[in-house]
Amino acid sequence: MEQRNRLGALGYLPPLLLHALLLFVADAAFTEVPKDVTVREGDDIEMPCAFRASGATSYSLEIQWWYLKEPPRELLHELALSVPGARSKVTNKDATKISTVRVQGNDISHRLRLSAVRLQDEGVYECRVSDYSDDDTQEHKAQAMLRVLSRFAPPNMQAAEAVSHIQSSGPRRHGPASAANANNAGAASRTTSEPGRGDKSPPPGSPPAAIDPAVPEAAAASAAHTPTTTVAAAAAASSASPPSGQAVLLRQRHGSGTGRSYTTDPLLSLLLLALHKFLRLLLGH
């Protein structure tokens, strides 16, 4: 029985040895790399970076975050096609170190946090891991691109949109009515201003105005029409107004309309009328 237990215990040794051998032989590598990100101005972002050293022995590991600004133009296409963790060709003399973390072990990780990003924060960010497991220090790099979009559109674009909105909504909705009102106002102003033109006499010394051929004909027709109108008005007045004697009788009978009315004897009225005619005859001789 004990012999079987020993053989069973020995049966677990090969897998354990194989696992330890794999840990020892496995190469160091990133377990988490930063990725390209596009954000708007004022947003907060995080870029992860994690690294595992080779073997199970505790080593000294150091991780650094660097800001490389904008990469060279000839590398932009290569950056778009390459894997984020394998970008080790982007170098910049103006690189700026952001942070440094150092641990004793075989795993290390550090997240880069940027709050309220600005347009000038756009560029390449690099995670550098220094592995001191061997006599020669090994350095591993992983890069990611940060793109920052403006939160607001340029002022000229806003002005263009406002003008476009006014042009598209204003005239279509109120254009015909405004045009009709403008035409009516223009016609009214012409109607009121035309009578005044004939009243104004030209200043002295100015050349005589051109006479329209139709004006004399209109004047002649007006002159011919004026006597006819005068005669008709006179006839109407004569037919409408009674003789003087009858007017006296009417005034005596009906009164002037403002004072008191008195009842008069018809005989007295005839006598007064005869007296009036007699006086006219005397005055005539």
UniProtKB/Swiss-Prot annotation:
Residues 177-189, 208-226 have a biased composition (Low complexity). It is found in: Membrane. Residues 29-143 form the Ig-like V-type domain. Residues 1-28 form the signal peptide. The chain crosses the membrane at residues 264-284. GO terms for cellular component: membrane. Keywords: Disulfide bond, Immunoglobulin domain, Membrane, Signal, Transmembrane, Transmembrane helix. Residues 161-226 are annotated as: Disordered. Pfam families: V-set. It is a single-pass type I membrane protein. PROSITE patterns: IG_LIKE. Residues 29-263 are extracellular. Residues 285 are cytoplasmic. Disulfide bonds join C49-C127. This is V-set and transmembrane domain-containing protein 2B.
